[in-house]
Amino acid sequence: MDFWLYKQAQQNGHHIAITDGQESYTYQNLYCEASLLAKRLKAYQQSRVGLYIDNSIQSIILIHACWLANIEIAMINTRLTPNEMKNQMRSIDVQLIFCTLPLELRGFQIVLLDDIEFAGRDITMNGLLDNTMDIQYDTSNETVVPKDSPSNILNTSFNLDDIASIMFTSGTTGPQKAVPQTFRNHYASAIGCKESLGFDRDTNWLSVLPIYHISGLSVLLRAVIEGFTVRIVDKFNAEQILTMIKNERITHISLVPQTLNWLMQQGLHEPYDLQKILLGGAKLSATMIETALQYNLPIYNSFGMTETCSQFLTATPQMLHARPDTVGMPSANVDVKIKNPNKEGHGELMIKGANVMNGYLYPTDLTGTFENGYFNTGDIAEIDYEGYVMIYDRRKDLIISGGENIYPYQIETVAKQFPGISDAVCVGHPDDTWGQVPKLYFVSESDISKAQLIAYLSQHLAKYKIPKHFEKVDTLPYTSTGKLQRNKLYRG
């Protein structure tokens, strides 16, 4: 199969592929620049490299260049400590890391993209021509692939079952797992998203989630497969993002719930040109859903994993209006089921589809990952009679107290409705009598007593679900994609 970028350069070459508000690259430009860089990357003779990158046009060119050079990319979370980075890269035998940001990491060959660009003056990232190759851009409507392009040097085709990217699970408990994502996985995910969410060549998708996470990288894959425009943004700033939404004909945006809250607080009270606001990474509160729908914001809740190459469950605004706690229904190209449901219908969520990884690269000795072709997500979920899926908690986060199963999410949802509490999380606390009891951490600017909280929670929860311990904190620990790091509270 021809590389998607190569096909877009042929068929959709004059369409804007990527813009950062200052520079814009058509698919023709992007393919030519990526091809030129790929030629240089081949000299490093690596089949797998680490990428330490930001949300920039340079980073996107680097990603495509690696793929054109048949190099697997292992994405590095830039917020990790040096030891965490070392452990991840060593676990999958990465020796060289390409960077668009400064990085010092002993024991690895670190190559800054700027050093590649200007090493021999035969490649730049600003459209300058190769000194040794007659690269010319054809601006006619008939031929959009650059004349004498490096396609005669680089292989323009690929195998769908080749590994495209490697990402590590967030690793909130236990060792981090290396997830290999093939081109087939990415393609199936993109097709599923198109069917359940909707996008086309006229889409203008604002992407501010980190590229090194699947939520960010998946937008780039959808774009190059479909041929739409990505408006790349490096850092989230509510005022700046709102200005872009108002002025740049943004049709799609991916956010975590907290960033949508900030945008609504900033003044996002109408959709403007927005057709789809894709939410994920954390649970939505009923209050936030109600507020967003009152503003006629086209919010779509979703659920996905690194192992499934992003979302495979999607809830439309209509679904959220009917049932705010749902993450929707599966894409048509995946199958989901509940393993060993209890009397309430709650059990472990299982998924099967071409978007699902084939198995972890590291550790290699994990058991129970797949059962009869279904991937075990590790999430406690329910599928109701209408086919709506509700995710309750990670199985590992379940609190078992005196033989009773307690879902932290249920307690957290009630606690967040207490006046003055802006955020809350419940974890299991060791107890000599019951094994575990719930402990609630909460964020508030008000003075709230334990007695007040117990009195309020008792109106909504069974007695055994009432937390036995309470702790007020300034903030709760979240990852860069908005996922709560419960392990830091377990240790705390």
UniProtKB/Swiss-Prot annotation:
Enzyme class: ligase
A Pfam short name: AMP-binding
Catalyzed reaction equations: 2-succinylbenzoate + ATP + CoA = 2-succinylbenzoyl-CoA + AMP + diphosphate
Recorded superkingdom: Bacteria
GO biological process, one term: menaquinone biosynthetic process
Annotated EC: 6.2.1.26
Pathway assigned to this chain's UniProt record: Quinol/quinone metabolism; 1,4-dihydroxy-2-naphthoate biosynthesis; 1,4-dihydroxy-2-naphthoate from chorismate: step 5/7; Quinol/quinone metabolism; menaquinone biosynthesis
GO MF term set: ATP binding; o-succinylbenzoate-CoA ligase activity
Keywords linked to the UniProt accession: ATP-binding, Ligase, Menaquinone biosynthesis, Nucleotide-binding
Protein family per UniProt: Belongs to the ATP-dependent AMP-binding enzyme family. MenE subfamily.
Function, in words: Converts 2-succinylbenzoate (OSB) to 2-succinylbenzoyl-CoA (OSB-CoA).
PANTHER family on file: LONG-CHAIN-FATTY-ACID--COA LIGASE, NONRIBOSOMAL PEPTIDE SYNTHASE PES1 (EUROFUNG)-RELATED
Name of the protein: 2-succinylbenzoate--CoA ligase
Organism (species): Staphylococcus aureus (strain bovine RF122 / ET3-1)
